[in-house]
Amino acid sequence: MSTVFEEDVTTKSALNVTEKEAIGRVAAGLVTNDDFVFIDAGTTTAAMIDFIYDNVRATFVTNGIVHAKKLIQKGLKAYIIGGQIKLTTEAVVGTEAINNLRKYNFTKTFIGTNGISVKGGYSTPDVEEAAVKSEVLKRGRNNFILGDHTKFDKEYAVTFGILKDACIVTDELEDNEFREHAVVKEAFA
């Protein structure tokens, strides 16, 4: 299945809330002192921020407008990259965003996705968001894709990475074929 449509943040934030919180809790637990972390825009990555310890000595970079606000409200050191703002996803995208990212070397990255498939890898409907995600994957030492069970076996218009590029953090995974191509951490396991 391939699609080019993407729902807005308000709609997506109401979907699979329990799953996003569970994934967010696991992902937040991966952040440690002295990490230099990228957090992608998106509703699952936003849920992660709620579970990051307030006293963690890490630095965060994000392309999510809401994410930057949530990070600084927790008293965490945060930067937001520059670029064009996309209203639908509240993400910073475009050439300027990619150029901003090229100066960073992240210890950990946490990236959202619309689709995860064995054949199509990690995908999203938007070319500009895919370009940002692809650059982040290149800049990260340890990459994590955050996606609930509804993202599996879905393919969108633009692939931004292959399965082996990142560890998948999900709520539950029934199809073991994905484990042959990527490390998978399950929140409900």
Where are these regions (language model features)?
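Conserved phosphate- and dinucleotide-binding cores of soluble alpha/beta proteins
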Residues: 66-189
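Short glycine-enriched, charge-decorated loop/helix-capping segments at active-site entrances
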Residues: 10-14, 57, 122-126
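Glycine- and other small-residue-rich loops at beta-strand/loop junctions that grip anionic moieties
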Residues: 16, 37, 60, 90, ...
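HTH-adjacent hinge/linker in prokaryotic transcriptional regulators
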Residues: 1-38, 49, 53-54, 71-76
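Electropositive phosphate-/nucleotide-binding environments in soluble metabolic enzymes
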Residues: 14-21, 25, 42, 91, ...
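Short beta-strand scaffold positions
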Residues: 39-40, 62, 170
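Short active-site oxyanion
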Residues: 33-37, 55-59, 141, 164-167
